[in-house]
């Protein structure tokens, strides 16, 4: 009897367990709602059952007037079946979802425009609210899709989007959830499908790291979230069926990369796990099986980073979630990198292996970034941390960007028309087309009148040299103030010849220029650039000059030409190439400089048959160019940033005095209340400041970085980028820096220097170059400090030379002992200060050679 009772109790227990499971499963299922709008049937899509909103359903009720259904046979996406119908409304429409338990829910709204009888989907406009939270405002679905395709086209990808899914995360109390669709007055709206999916509370943490700051509380209990982007970095697109917990879609990252070949895809599908078991809802393991890491073969400047660029709505807070999984290295300190979000350092010294506790373990990091009202772009960038000894590489597996609600709003204020352009832009285009047409008519008649006058003048007068005039050149206007170098520009437009009496020096005739260059003989060409050619010339009195003749058709060259004129008309210094004069006859644009007899510094280092420079000559050349740069940075109120410091822009005169040249890319420094100048990245590969490249923020420290590359180039005598060398030697800055950090720079110096330099001077020289190449500008010295240090290095070397020659009046060890621990440098040396004063008073140009 006891056995029978025991068996009975076992059966009863099994039945209770079964019913407990069924009830629990039913409650879990009741948390999710899948609605096929405009349909009266149930449809199986992505392994889930979607119920038509016309089917009897106590959990979902539909309230609204004049709501109609529409259907189509089109569709090829995973959701094609539920996109065949839609709910169309021209009055307020409410969907009420009953039986909601307290917690967080993904609300996904599906839109797929198609032809609807008596309605033009291109003109639909409506708003959506969820329990008082505004999700969308006067949205035009066709315009949103067209705008997405425009972005894809701009990045060179196929524009194939035909539908739109808006995903929101909403904190909801127990009871019900009401979604309200409100058409704009006189318009209508539509929706194809709605899904409400319960979300684990562990998906988002309340406390996150603010970019550039400390831990902050998100306050998610009272805020809604919109998913802006969700990417499977380095891997294929993952549809909802690949993310069975939350049925999310993970796009590929290629269309958002700034430079696609900056990163390569890596994959490892074996034994991938979560670092923490609770992280399973965060992302499917498939996301962690692939990644993108920095490319060593396609990107010459390995210090640069992988960058992704995203269009966002201004004036919102954004939660950036980055997914990582170390797939290759098998111990700590092998891959260490930095994370940058919108030009700020979010994390430094980031080691995936250390954070995850091993290889093949998926982790994620959250960062909060407030985007200002003036910014509509969010940058995500990863780059190696040069301050540590790990490999120069970075890796990312996944990326998500979430917008946080502000004052009960998630809707963006920018509206797009059916072409994908903002409504304000469309209106302005119509206005400008009308205005442009009127202006074109006026210009036509003005041009016609000018043409008649010119033809009449041509009949009366012919120029002997008209046959040599270059075509297509436009007059050059300058915006400069010719009173003092420190005075602010007035913005007045001055033609070149109006500057002759002030800062531009002598005005040459075209006949004089032709005579000096033997009619622009190519045999006298000594340089060429985007602006045109540079010729060696000789005046009647035997004075040698350099003549820069601009190419009429080069707009880029023209802009640089104008910049150089503005800069040189304000600058006078012994270590800057001097402007002698100009010529603007017959629409020519010609500048005349002092002739630098010994050419570029690079030509004396490698690539020519010229005799190599001694160590002392190289130091003196570096000191001279440093003096010129120091003057640029400090010689005026805002200073000037050269932006193209390299050995081909350092010229040597007949006495090997070094002078900076080529100011076509130069930029005025930041004003007193700013720390940098925001500008597009320009410069020469191999010399570019990586921080400037990442943030597009220019400072004088960018010149310091480039000068650090010059220092290594001067001592190693090789190209800064040489793709024919082994990978670790391609980039001179990285290669030399690695040897310098080992305190073994002498192993890679120019063989012509061996035995002819002071070891102590080389050691100090290497330390200066290393400081110049610090990854962050704030850790680099000022150019004045670099100048002082180089002068000190020269003293050490000269003391060594005297000792070698038997002169013991001053030893290199004494020089080391006398060096101060810290130092400051006045704005200019005595010799240069007089030149600065002369520049500021706008006195006549003199030849400083």
From Swiss-Prot:
One Pfam family per UniProt: Malectin_like
Q: What is its main location?
A: membrane
Q: Which UniProt keywords apply?
A: ATP-binding, Cell membrane, Glycoprotein, Kinase, Membrane, Nucleotide-binding, Serine/threonine-protein kinase, Signal, Transferase, Transmembrane, Transmembrane helix
Ranges annotated as spanning the membrane: 430-450
What's one GO-annotated cellular component? plasma membrane
**Quick one: a GO biological-process term for this protein?**
response to brassinosteroid
Membrane topology according to the record: Single-pass type I membrane protein
What protein does this entry describe? Probable receptor-like protein kinase At1g30570
Q: Where is the Protein kinase domain?
A: 520-793
Quote the catalytic residue positions: 644
EC number(s) from the headed UniProt entry: 2.7.11.-
Subcellular locations according to the entry = Cell membrane
Record's compositionally biased regions (Polar residues): 827-849
Residues carrying sugar: 40, 57, 94, 122, 158, 268, 271, 305, 343
Segments for region (Disordered) = 810-849
Q: Where would one find the signal peptide in this protein?
A: 1-28
Residues the entry annotates as binding ATP: 526-534, 548
GO terms for molecular function, please?
ATP binding; protein serine/threonine kinase activity
| Record topological domains on the Extracellular side | 29-429
């Amino acid at each position: 009897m006891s056995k029978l009772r025991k068996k009975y109790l076992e059966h009863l227990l099994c039945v209770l367990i079964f019913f407990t499971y069924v009830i629990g499963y039913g409650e879990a299922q009741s948390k999710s709602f899948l609605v096929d709008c405009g349909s009266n049937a149930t449809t199986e899509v992505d392994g889930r059952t979607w119920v038509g909103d016309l089917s009897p359903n106590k959990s979902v009720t539909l309230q609204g007037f004049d709501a109609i259904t529409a259907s189509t046979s089109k569709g090829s996406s995973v959701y094609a079946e539920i996109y065949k119908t839609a709910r169309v409304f021209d009055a307020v429409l409410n969907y009420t979802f009953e039986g909601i338990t307290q917690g967080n829910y993904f609300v996904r709204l599906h839109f797929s425009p198609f032809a609807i009888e008596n309605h033009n989907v291109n003109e639909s406009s409506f708003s959506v609210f969820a329990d008082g939270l505004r999700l969308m405002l006067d949205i035009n679905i066709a315009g949103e899709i067209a705008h997405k395709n425009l972005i894809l086209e701009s990045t060179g990808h196929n524009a194939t989007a035909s539908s739109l899914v808006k995903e929101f995360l909403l904190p909801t109390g127990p009871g019900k959830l009401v979604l309200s669709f409100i058409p704009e007055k006189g318009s209508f709206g539509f929706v194809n499908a709605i899904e409400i999916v319960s979300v684990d509370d562990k998906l988002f943490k309340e406390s996150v790291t603010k970019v550039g700051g400390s831990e902050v509380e998100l306050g998610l209990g009272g805020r809604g979230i919109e998913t802006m982007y969700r990417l499977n970095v380095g891997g294929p697109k993952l549809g909802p069926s690949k993310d069975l917990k939350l049925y999310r879609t993970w796009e590929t990252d290629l269309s958002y990369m700034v430079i696609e070949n900056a990163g390569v895809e890596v994959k490892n599908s074996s034994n991938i796990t979560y670092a923490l078991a609770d992280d399973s809802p965060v992302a499917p393991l498939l996301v962690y099986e692939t990644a993108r890491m920095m490319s060593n073969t396609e990107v010459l400047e390995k210090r640069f980073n992988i960058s992704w660029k995203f269009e966002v709505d201004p004036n919102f807070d954004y939660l950036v979630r980055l997914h990582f999984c170390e797939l290759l290295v098998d111990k700590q300190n092998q891959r260490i990198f930095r994370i940058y979000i919108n030009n700020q350092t979010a994390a430094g010294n980031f080691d995936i292996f250390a954070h995850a506790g091993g290889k093949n373990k998926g982790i994620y990091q959250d960062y909060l970034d407030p985007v200002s009202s003036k910014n509509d772009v969010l940058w995500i960038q990863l780059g190696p941390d040069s301050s540590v000894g790990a490999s120069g590489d970075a890796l990312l597996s996944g990326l998500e960007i979430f917008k946080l609600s502000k004052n009960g709003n998630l809707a963006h204020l920018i509206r797009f028309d059916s072409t994908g352009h903002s409504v304000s832009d469309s209106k302005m285009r119509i206005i400008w087309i009308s205005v442009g047409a009127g202006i074109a008519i006026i210009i036509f008649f003005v041009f016609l009148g000018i043409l008649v006058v010119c033809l009449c003048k041509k009949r009366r007068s012919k120029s002997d040299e008209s046959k040599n005039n270059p075509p297509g050149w436009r007059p050059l206007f300058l915006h400069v103030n010719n009173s003092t170098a420190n005075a602010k520009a007035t913005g007045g437009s001055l033609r070149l010849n109006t500057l002759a009496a002030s800062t531009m020096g002598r005005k040459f005739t075209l006949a004089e220029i032709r005579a000096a260059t033997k009619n622009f003989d190519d045999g006298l060409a000594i340089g060429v650039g985007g602006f045109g050619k540079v010729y060696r010339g000789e005046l009647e009195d035997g004075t040698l000059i350099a003549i820069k003749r601009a190419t009429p058709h080069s707009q880029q060259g023209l802009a640089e030409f104008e910049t150089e004129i503005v800069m040189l008309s304000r600058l006078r210094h012994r270590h800057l190439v001097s402007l002698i004069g100009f010529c603007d006859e017959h629409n020519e644009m010609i500048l005349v400089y002092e002739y630098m007899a010994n050419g570029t510094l690079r030509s004396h280092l490698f690539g020519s048959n010229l005799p190599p420079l001694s160590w002392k000559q190289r130091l003196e050349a570096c000191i001279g160019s440093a003096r010129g740069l120091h003057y640029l940075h400090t010689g005026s109120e805002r200073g000037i940033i050269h932006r193209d410091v390299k050995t081909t822009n350092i010229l040597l005169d007949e006495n090997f005095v070094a002078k900076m040249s080529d100011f076509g890319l130069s930029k005025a420094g930041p004003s007193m209340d700013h720390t940098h100048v925001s500008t597009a990245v320009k410069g020469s590969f191999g010399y570019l400041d990586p921080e400037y490249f990442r943030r597009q923020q220019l400072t004088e420290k960018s010149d310091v970085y480039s000068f650090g590359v010059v220092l290594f180039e001067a001592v190693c005598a090789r190209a800064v980028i040489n793709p024919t060398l082994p990978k670790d030697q391609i980039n001179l800055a990285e290669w030399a820096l690695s040897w310098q950090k080992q305190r073994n720079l002498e192993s890679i110096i120019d063989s012509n220097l061996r035995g002819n330099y002071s070891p102590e001077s080389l050691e100090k020289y290497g330390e200066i170059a290393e400081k110049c190449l610090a990854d962050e500008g704030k850790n680099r010295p000022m150019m004045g400090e670099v100048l002082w240090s180089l002068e000190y290095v020269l003293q050490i070397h000269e003391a060594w030379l005297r000792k070698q020659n038997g002169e013991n009046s001053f030893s290199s060890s004494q020089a080391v002992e006398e060096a101060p621990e810290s130092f400051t440098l006045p704005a200019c040396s005595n010799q240069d200060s007089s030149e600065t004063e002369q520049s500021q008073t706008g006195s006549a140009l003199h030849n400083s050679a």
